[in-house]
């Protein structure tokens, strides 16, 4: 329902504090030597500032705003602020539902209704928090503490996966929220869900949240390494859940591309051998991401190339056979390109004696 990210037509939650001034970019010096103009304290003042700022263009001279236009603009801005207040109230109502204790003497029907209400609250919050302003407000309302402390470990799988999804939704591309979530110890709990939960949906949503906390987030990646996250990721790739396998392989590939400094760690874990073993399983679209990860692991990394050349792996023969299989299938073009790149990188030269010299 809400626009994603900070873009769209939503107005900012609050004006900047007076100490920051109100200029933005290179055009903010038009006030001359009189200092920064006073910031408006209400909607009427904001409207007046917008009109004044618009009239500073020297050429052509601005036309006076008609009363009809002025009224329309004021109503539109009022509606925007009112909509934001309403969404904050919705989030507060959801948090009231989620904060309630489960009735200790409730019967089966009452417990089912209670769970449905909590699931509905989590779903509405996930919808609202697609907007970055709402996600920030949710965290200011201590919503993240409630999710991490209570709902990631809830007894009902429907609550666990919705909590993981909401954590990921709030954390996407917002460093301040990522840092708060990491500080609450969420990554350890999410990795445990990915590795051990009995519900496939919980595991998929946990992986989504993990991805939002470690991609482009150095502190998150360091925690991921300390918690042996790559081993958890490899085990997820070995499961029978196709969506989980694909998303795990894609995250591994992304981390290898973005953080090549960890290739040595992965090789020491036997990652090359495990990836090749996955390629040997019955063919599926998942193999494209496995081969992509393997390509990333050997690119500009002689240790990875040497391990791929180990005769007992039989990788060269496997890749040549796979190329023959894929050549007539346009839908597997990217996988074919990965196979050809691996052949070129690992098996185009006759020996590896000079690789590190």
From Swiss-Prot:
Gene Ontology BP terms: positive regulation of proteasomal ubiquitin-dependent protein catabolic process; positive regulation of protein ubiquitination
Swiss-Prot/TrEMBL keywords: Phosphoprotein, Repeat
Matching Pfam families: Fes1
Keyword Repeat: yes
Tissues/organs with expression: Ubiquitous.
Molecular function terms from GO: adenyl-nucleotide exchange factor activity; molecular sequestering activity; ubiquitin protein ligase binding
Top-level division of the source organism's lineage: Eukaryota
Keyword Cell inner membrane: no
Bias type Low complexity, positions: 19-29
Residues annotated with Phosphoserine modification: 349, 354
Function, as annotated: Inhibits HSPA1A chaperone activity by changing the conformation of the ATP-binding domain of HSPA1A and interfering with ATP binding. Interferes with ubiquitination mediated by STUB1 and inhibits chaperone-assisted degradation of target proteins.
UniProt name for this protein: Hsp70-binding protein 1
Species, as recorded: Rattus norvegicus (Rat)
Phylogenetic classification of the source organism: Eukaryota, Metazoa, Chordata, Craniata, Vertebrata
Gene this protein is translated from: Hspbp1
């Amino acid at each position: 329902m809400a626009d994603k990210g900070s873009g769209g037509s939503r107005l900012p939650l609050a004006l900047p504090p007076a100490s920051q001034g109100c200029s933005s970019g290179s055009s903010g010096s038009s006030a001359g030597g009189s200092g920064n103009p006073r910031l408006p304290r209400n909607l009427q003042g904001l409207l007046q500032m917008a009109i004044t700022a618009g009239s500073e263009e020297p050429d052509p001279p601005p036309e006076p705003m008609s009363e009809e236009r002025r009224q329309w603009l004021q109503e539109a801005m009022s509606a925007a602020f009112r909509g934001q207040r309403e969404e904050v109230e919705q989030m507060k109502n959801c948090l009231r539902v989620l904060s309630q204790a489960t009735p200790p003497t409730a019967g089966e029907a009452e417990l089912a209704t209670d769970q449905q209400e909590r699931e509905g609250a989590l779903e509405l919050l996930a919808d609202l928090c697609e907007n970055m302003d709402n996600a920030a407000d949710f965290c200011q309302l201590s919503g993240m503490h409630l999710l991490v402390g209570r709902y990631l470990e809830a007894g009902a799988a429907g609550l666990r996966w919705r909590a993981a999804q909401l954590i990921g939704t709030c954390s996407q591309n917002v460093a301040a929220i990522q840092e708060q979530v990491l500080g609450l110890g969420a990554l350890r709990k999410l990795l445990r869900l990915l590795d051990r939960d009995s519900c496939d949906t919980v595991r998929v949503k946990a992986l989504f949240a993990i991805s939002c906390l470690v991609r482009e987030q150095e502190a998150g990646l360091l925690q991921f390494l300390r918690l042996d996250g790559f081993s958890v990721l490899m085990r997820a790739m070995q499961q029978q859940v196709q969506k989980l396998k694909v998303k795990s392989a894609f995250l591994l590939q992304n981390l290898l591309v973005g953080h090549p400094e960890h290739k040595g760690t992965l090789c020491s874990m036997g990652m090359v051998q495990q990836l090749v073993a996955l390629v040997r399983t019955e063919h599926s679209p998942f193999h494209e991401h496995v081969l992509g990860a393997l390509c990333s692991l050997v690119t500009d990394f002689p240790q990875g190339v040497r391990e791929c050349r180990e005769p007992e792996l039989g990788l060269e023969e496997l890749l040549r056979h796979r190329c023959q299989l894929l050549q007539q299938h346009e839908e597997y073009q990217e996988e074919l390109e990965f196979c050809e790149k691996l052949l070129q990188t690992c098996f185009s030269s006759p020996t590896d004696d000079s690789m590190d010299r």
